[in-house]
């Protein structure tokens, strides 16, 4: 196995986790004020609702972990990114408290799903022998995102005047990031699961 391919794959996984965590931290750290901006909910109401839906962060680790076992890690991460892109683009125009609550719960599910999927992603790509070291390195993306995320929010809020204004910007970032799970594949393989799927469909249609 070529070392360069291993390094590129490791960097791709690191970037995938970093971007998902950055989006999650942006959202989680400002969920209550964003909910209040969008719906006009009272502070106590928004805080109580967020406290209730916070459980989806934990559930996402199990849900997306199970989904990735069935459809593959790349597809799972593509869906995690994709659902957030759609929500971050549209939620700014929604002012119904129940609907905003549902969308927020899905974002929390996606945030937890990034963590639930990445350990298996790492093991699939690099094996389990050095799992602690490999995943430990990739997990540094969490720490870096914890620094970058709040700075990103502060800059965008200064420019837009609201916390909710940061969501479409993050949606654009995640939309671009959707290329990562498409082009990333195991170091020992010649092509990724998306390319293999296209080849299979082409052969069936031929």
Language model features with spans:
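A membrane-interface helix-boundary motif in multi-pass transporters
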Residues: 155-172
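Multi-pass alpha-helical transporter architecture, strongest
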Residues: 171-206
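A late C-terminal transmembrane helix in Major Facilitator Superfamily
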Residues: 125-160
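Hydrophobic core of transmembrane alpha-helices in multi-pass small-molecule transporters
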Residues: 18, 99-113
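C-terminal ends and interior cores of transmembrane alpha-helices
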Residues: 83-95
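Extracytoplasmic gate region of multi-pass secondary transporters
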Residues: 5-66, 119, 149, 153
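Cytoplasmic membrane-interface "Motif A"-like loop-to-helix N-cap segments
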Residues: 70-81
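Intracellular juxtamembrane helix-capping segments at the cytosolic ends
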Residues: 113-126
